[in-house]
Amino acid sequence: SSSAASDVYKRQPIMLIAALCIKLYDHGPVFFKQKRLTIGGKEFYVYKFRSMIVDAEKDGVARLATKNDSRITPVGKVIRATRIDELPQLLNIFKGDMSVVGPRPERPEIAKEYEESIPEFAYRLKVKAGLTGYAQIYGKYNTTAYDKLKLDLMYIESYSILEDLKLILATFKIVFTKES
């Protein structure tokens, strides 16, 4: 969409600074891509600025990041705290893999684990994955997968353009205030 292209253009200085900081810190790759799921279980690569050490999962085991994860670099801590690490996902929105609002895209192997213990988890794939949503606005970093799922399902049940606009505004408020 043209608004996603416009957002990428407006954020170029921030993205350039983030890219330089990541590269200067450890000379590793600036971007990180990872297979995720969107509507209908379709796989796609999500793009982010790399916030962890190179080869953070070299053992091949998929692990969710924790609050004080030792794999997160000092630059990574800053770009995660400010949500700058998510900006490359504007490209995913532009490509049509994601929408601005919707459940966060999950990794296939982690989604499979969740579906085994929470069968309703698959319901999240009825809509396109998003950059922000109820779980990001009303949940906290340490919210359980089940609680995030309940928030995602609330979003799916109450979807509307007006609701999406409210969530986008709430996201900006969170990103640009200290309480987040």
Predicted regions and their residues:
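Extracellular interaction modules
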Residues: 1-5
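A hydrophobic, helix-centered structural microdomain
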Residues: 6-55, 92, 161, 166-180
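Residue-level signal for short amphipathic helical patches enriched in basic/charged
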Residues: 12, 82-85, 101, 140, ...
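Short hydrophobic/aromatic residue motifs in ordered secondary structure
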Residues: 14-16, 86, 133
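Short, hydrophobic secondary-structure boundary micro-motifs
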Residues: 18, 32-33, 61, 101-103, ...
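Short, glycine-rich, amphipathic interfacial segments at transmembrane boundaries or analogous
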Residues: 32-71, 132-150
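A short, structured surface patch at a secondary-structure boundary
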Residues: 65-128, 167-175
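C-terminal terminal-structure detector
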Residues: 120-180
